């Protein structure tokens, strides 16, 4: 069984030799939780661009071909998935990968879910399961190269936090299926096993169109209006347990916890855009929300031509 959507499903991911887990984040990155509204199952119209086009099927997870709002066609293209999907195994609590060599590959899909080519990574630009659950890879080809050979255009990572109650689609390349629902608030602290995430995206529940499963880990969360990536799918409560692996819980301000069996979550991706200098990740930039490694880090990633 492939890894679930997130770090949850750690056991399942471990069987595959994939990475998956949750991790603590600095208190400065914590966001105020928002209570879920009364959830009524709802039908969300799926837009054409919210299909499987520009998603990337990995051997253990889902992923997508992405770009920053400021990326140029001559920049090296990027692959986005979960930190727990890292090919080297689970990242430990406290671990941050920066500019690490990688040779993983994936199948780039069209809107119908058919493979239109193979993409190859050269390095992990950034990956962590501390406070967030993300892995961003640099690929061998530029956006222009990929567009020329396959016709695929990368999804744009939004530079702002998604709006509560906004309609979303979650295209899973692993399963060739798109889930649709809406955002139902944000969780200041979401805990699962040894890991903690902040400002997590809570999906509308109950909603049969948004029951993400193992293998949907790393799927982009696409806003149905802007058609931009506003988050990344990563976990859900399987059994109704509190704060255990595959059973994330919401931690309230007073320290009490709540958990709902079947409730699914995603993580923020606009954080990447708070850390860009000259179109490269700069963890030292003021206001950067991404978790920093223990040692100082200099900018890395695709550079904007001067």
Residue ranges and their predicted role:
Residues 114-123, 164-167, 176-194:
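Beta-strand/loop subdomains of soluble extracytoplasmic proteins
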Residues 45, 50-52, 57-61, 144-153, ...:
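Active-site region of chymotrypsin-like
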Residues 1-32:
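Secretory targeting and sorting signals
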Residues 35-53, 57, 67-71, 87, ...:
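Conserved catalytic-core segment of clan PA serine endopeptidases
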Residues 26-50, 281-306:
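Composition-driven, intrinsically disordered low-complexity tracts enriched in small residues
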Residues 58-60, 74-76, 80, 101, ...:
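Extracytoplasmic
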Residues 48-53, 162-171:
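Short coil-to-beta transition motif at edge beta-strands of beta-rich domains
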Residues 70-71, 77-81, 223-230:
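Short, glycine-anchored, charge-dense loop/turn motifs used at functional sites
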